[in-house]
Amino acid sequence: MATPDSLALFTGLGLSENKARETLKNAALSTQLREAATQAQQTLGSTIDKATGTLLYGLASRLRDTRRLSFLVGYIANKKIHTELQLSAALEYVRSHPLDPIDTKDFEQECGVGVVVTPEQIEEAVEATINRHRPQLLVERYRFSMGLLMGEARAALRWADGKMIKNEVDMQVLHLLGPKMEADLEKKPKVAKARLEETDRKTAKDVVENGEVAGQTLSLMEQLRGEALKFHKPGENYKTPGYVTTPHTMDLLKQHLEITGGQVRTRFPPEPNGILHIGHAKAINFNFGYAKANNGICFLRFDDTNPEKEEAKFFTAIYDMVTWLGYTPYKVTYASDYFDQLYAWAVELIRRGQAYVCHQRGEELKGHNPLPSPWRDRPIEESLLLFEAMRKGKFAEGEATLRMKLVMEDGKMDPVAYRVKYTPHHRTGDKWCIYPTYDYTHCLCDSIEHITHSLCTKEFQARRSSYFWLCNALDVYCPVQWEYGRLNLHYAVVSKRKILQLVAAGAVRDWDDPRLFTLTALRRRGFPPEAINNFCARVGVTVAQTTMEPHLLEACVRDVLNDTAPRAMAVLEPLQVVITNFPAPKPLDIRVPNFPADETKGFHQVPFASTVFIERTDFKEESEPGYKRLAWGQPVGLRHTGYVIELQHVVRGSSGCVECLEVTCRRADAGEKPKAFIHWVSQPLVCEIRLYERLFQHKNPEDPVEVPGGFLSDLNPASLQVIKGALVDCSVALAKPFDKFQFERLGYFSVDPDSHQGQVVFNRTVTLKEDPGKV
């Protein structure tokens, strides 16, 4: 019999011509639907009714395991599956039972095959449901949620036809309440809802000091919204699209559940060859956060398989950053913990004919279409002997590798599993001269630790096939790898290589230079870990790569520091002010609230003497429209003192520059209120203040179109300003590195580790308000 025209075949199933043409554009779907329709015609003849056609289309578009197509089409064609509800149950059943053979008796029971629900049963179930809600129905009448009645009746009669249930509900409600009256047609008042929404908005966003709005801090599960909520349950790995099953899968999953007790297990697996950056913060939050949200555990596993690039300081710094962000690893492990097991598995892989020793050089393997290895089909015994020779150091670096026999998604053929490296390892010393690659190590370490959800950034998607293949080739437990989009920031570079170039060029001091977006740099600048976590939460977890503006991160920083950084006063460009009629023979102690908006958080004292210092920019000899601070004829208040000062005399130096102001003071409540109150210091400490701006001038400094000269040509010459002679009040005298303050009217500042006795150094973390020019 000739194969009918596909368009005619699809329209014969009840699809519109447009829908049929659209389906034909999808090769996989059209192939599957064609097979389903052709098989159904063998049972039903050339004419297929629309209801059956709809089920066949639903099957073809939703079935992931094509091995089950013929089995399910048979049930549809023979009218054993005749409702959408049954089809959904059937699809869920085959997804949950990936291995042959299918228990047909169990399958039919779970899918309602042969179950007949009579009109009388529907009538009785609906009547029982209505009786349960009768009092409320009589009060609310047609405003009552009919969906609730439908849902309860459906639950009582799982395989009943939905339309029949709805018709019965409508009929019995009409019989109980009678026809709708005018009052039933009125919409429910929305006053309560509007008030609730207003309350929610006030709860979510509080107006805070300096006119800013504090953003809502997202909960852990809100952070894990989107794709992450579709994750499989532990032990149900096979329900994940694309997961590869073997005859051993279900037994291995059973053993896995016995070991883990159904516990969620994740891991954060950094390479110890550099410092973590803001993108890693998302990975840390996702891995640790997902485990925590599900009462699970998260490993910190160092992928230490590149001994020549690893340094002890990176291990320490990575652990410090994970704990600084507020997470405690269940266990700290190393890929090197498993070197013996990994080697034994490599030998087993060769024995199974799935790996071979190759002598192609690294340069021969590069490019899009490298030549196939002439050693791919060498005898197993020969590869075993050569691999042992590699382990014993009988090959020079680059002379031999162990390669796996598979083709990856990106077309890369036979990835390398082991290579020769004559570099002592920081943990194993000179025990090994062969080291496993990421492609070989990653999935097997996940398997050893019984990771349930292996969460990776999107660039590792091309390695998913090798992940599943390797675990299955060795018949070991196979976790699920799930990829999500990286988090990037504009005006930043985070590549280890490029940061080293910045350091070498003198553009930054080191990995922790506050202008960088490494986590050590952000900590040094004064970014609280809670702010970084909140930022990651707001970004969320999606498959798409995300590039964010730095000002969004800075907004999260302000939200946290506004509530946690006590206030102090500092003057960047000091101008001396002498109060000629100071009201006391000695300095007064001024009580200043640590947090003006919440005085329950305590106070600190600062001295107020006859000589104070104000910002030079807070004085102008001639006032101008809009200017409210100190000028001739325009007094100004001194914050927290209760006093107002008025200019009497300007003292100039030999160059004509203003050196000192002589003023008189009065109580603020003894006359007209001044237009402004300014900050000041008296008997202050001298300090160094470092003001930071963006390191790069363009959004995408690595883009050759935007920055043709390369990222080093895009440096902002004004990214750092050092003020040596700044003054700060004595309340910060005992501050330690990383202590944070809000300097009133100036911004948030953090004590730098460069501070020493007698010289405090402050880094400006962020300004008080976002600079509109930065958006």
Swiss-Prot record:
SUPFAM superfamilies: Nucleotidylyl transferase (SSF52374), Ribosomal protein L25-like (SSF50715). It comes from the Eukaryota. GO terms for molecular function: ATP binding; glutamine-tRNA ligase activity; protein kinase binding; protein kinase inhibitor activity. Monomer. Part of a multisubunit complex that groups tRNA ligases for Arg (RARS1), Asp (DARS1), Gln (QARS1), Ile (IARS1), Leu (LARS1), Lys (KARS1), Met (MARS1) the bifunctional ligase for Glu and Pro (EPRS1) and the auxiliary subunits AIMP1/p43, AIMP2/p38 and EEF1E1/p18. Interacts with RARS1. Part of a complex composed of RARS1, QARS1 and AIMP1. It is found in: Cytoplasm, Cytosol; Cytoplasm. It comes from Rattus norvegicus (Rat). CDD domains: GlnRS_core. ATP binds at residues 271-273, 277-283, 457, 486-487, 494-496. One of its GO terms (cellular component) is cytoplasm. The modification N6-acetyllysine is found at residue 309. Glutamine--tRNA ligase. Plays a critical role in brain development. The gene is Qars1. This is Glutamine--tRNA ligase. Detected in dorsal root ganglia (at protein level). Detected in dorsal root ganglia. Induction: Down-regulated after peripheral nerve injury. The lineage of its organism: Eukaryota, Metazoa, Chordata, Craniata, Vertebrata.
